[in-house]
Amino acid sequence: MTCLAWNTTPTLTDLCRAIEQHTAPLYLIVCLPENHIPDFSLSNQPSELEGRLNNRLVQAIKCLQFNNVNVLENLLPDVHLWLVPPHRTDRLHEHFPHIEWQTKAIPQSTPTPLKPWFRRPEHQAAPEHVLIIGAGIAGAATARKLAEHGVRVTVLEAGKTAQAGSGNRQGLLYAKISPHNTEQTELLLTGYGYTRRLLEDLLPDSDAWGDDGVLHVNFDDSERKRNQALGLQHQHKHLYRSVSAEEAAHIAGIDVFSDGLYWPQGVWLNPPAVVHALLNHPLIELHEHSPLTAVSHNGTQWTAHTPNAHFNASHIVYCMGAHSPTAADTNVSALPFRQIRGQTGVVSASPFSQKLRCAISGESYISPSWQCSHCYGATFVLNSNDETWYPHEEADNRAALHQLNPPLAQSLFSDGLQTPPLQSTQGHAALRCDSLDHLPVVGALGDIAAMQSAYAKLALDKNYRLDNITCPYLPNAYINTAHGTRGLATAPICAAAIAAEILGLPHPISQRLRTALHPNRAIIRAIIRQQPLLSV
């Protein structure tokens, strides 16, 4: 692994020369001089390699964000480009173990010491075979990322692939962000571009996604205030911009009766198609209808038991979504999760609704027609574990659609929104998993009972110095879950983060985010509050 860095934007000729002179895997790190999309200028007589690289870059840089690093994977086979905004160029040590500067080096900041429970596990073994528990978007993306690096993966799914939170007919890739640089905003912006580029590579010619953008209408004063603040962030005007009601109508193809915020690279997509495409790899073995009933570690490997078989592997990653609270390992199930019930509807397109060119989102959403049908919704019921489809929630979704766009709803339903009959609608009901602080749970799994013992003094003083006590992690065990309603934007980048942890690769997210997402945050918080997650 070679990591080359420039303190300004190099020419394509410079990049191609570096590619030709070094052996893959190769990481090309460009420290951007300003918060603008860089211009990688072509030479007067570009080489074949320069032309190929330019063609890949034209599409890949459309979704750059300037909150954190941008990871552009496999622009050429095993050649990865990282674009770093100016305020992050002194923190490359958070991502790369070593760097070879091709220009004058940018001085690096001193790393901030980490609490022991946020440090990486010591003495990590190289993966021989990895078990992934769960075949939704998080499990599929994690499996794919490991397989692309030559690791054999077995995926165990309790039911059928992409039938829970990843089972909607049409979902939206978007980033409903704050105008402030919160951890969630950083994650959503980083993940948004990452998933957008993933779609281009994974399903370049598929009709299972559409790239006409997502329009967020200002449905109340709070939403208008948030979107207007975002619209003033000119460094991201290529990602999102404020639009008037007239421009919004022109973009959507129908009147939307409101101004809003337009994401031109936003997409609707069919989540099951994405999940199946991710799992389509020769090193991935999928077992459906294989619920995990027990798990054990014998000192060298994990054994996962299902009703009909058992599976051995060196590593295990839990990507169980809404099933996380019932995981066979209490080090997963004891973590504090919230289940959120959601239901969507599907209706045949009308002549009027077929004019809709982009997805519209407000308090509810509707996608453009795909295969002559629209998907719309969704309900949001906290702390529910009921996956039954209900007519009364279908009525709620129709009413919400009518509030979002009355002419559109009236063209799709008649008789006071009662036709077609509520019971006949083909929709989807499923549970989503969320954490108490609304951030995903991603990283190495701690041994909860051992941590409660090792760090018990935090219950008396949350600032007690315990820096010399190594965190008792479970051996080679990880988690990627609790993506809530934002999994399309967050799960793939978190899958890349898990792969980086397991394989020792450059890390695609900042240390700030790794700390914010770490599963140990909940364990330590519970100890400090004298509310231990496990009774010992």
Model-derived segments and spans:
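Beta1/beta-strand and adjacent pyrophosphate-binding region of the FAD-binding site
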Residues: L4, E122-A138, T154
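C-terminal catalytic lobe of FAD-dependent flavoproteins
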Residues: S414-V536
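Glycine-rich FAD pyrophosphate-binding loop
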Residues: E148-G167
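Dinucleotide-binding Rossmann-like beta1-alpha1 core, especially the glycine-rich loop
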Residues: G171-I251, Q423
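Helical element adjacent to the flavin cofactor pocket in flavoenzyme catalytic cores
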Residues: L261-P307, F311-H315, C319-T326
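Helix-loop-beta segment of a Rossmann-like dinucleotide-binding subdomain
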Residues: P179-H180, D205-H216, S242-N280, T379-L382, ...
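Flavin-dependent oxidoreductases
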Residues: A141, E186, P307-A399, P407-Q426
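The AdoMet/dcAdoMet-binding core of the Class I SAM-like
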Residues: T2-S109
